[in-house]
Amino acid sequence: YKRQTVAIMLILFGIFFLVVETWNKGKTAKIHSIGELTYTSALIIGAFQLIAAVFPGTSRSGATILGAILIGVSRTVAAEYTFFLAVPVMFGASALKLVKFGFHFTSAEAILLAVGMIVAFVVSILTIKFLMGYIKKHDFKAFGWYRIVLGAAVILYFVLAR
């Protein structure tokens, strides 16, 4: 990927988060539980994953959360659903890597892989728990600003590195 594209998409999606959160302020969500999602809303939210696949520097989770909020899903349900969507994506990516390596691992490599998976799982659970608690009290504007600052820092780094 071109670093300029990644930096620009970081900034653009940061701005998109700020715009969506400002537009959404004071509005009441229409969907308050995952059980209320329809096939149509699931299809729309899932389609937002394509944005992340097409544009490097775009967060898959961020894209699906924004898509969900835009169709009236509450922040907590949007984040929860996004994390559920990640399971098949990550499982598929991991399975693809295993197939690519032909399942040929030494005992030491298999142990390292297992330890890495366990640590990643525990850290993911803790991170999701923290994020869900944060989302219940805050909007995603901080994430938008983070993306803008990170994108600007990436641009600045490569300008100064010349």
Where are these regions (language model features)?
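Multi-pass membrane proteins that catalyze or facilitate reactions on polyprenyl-/lipid-phosphate substrates
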Residues: 1-162
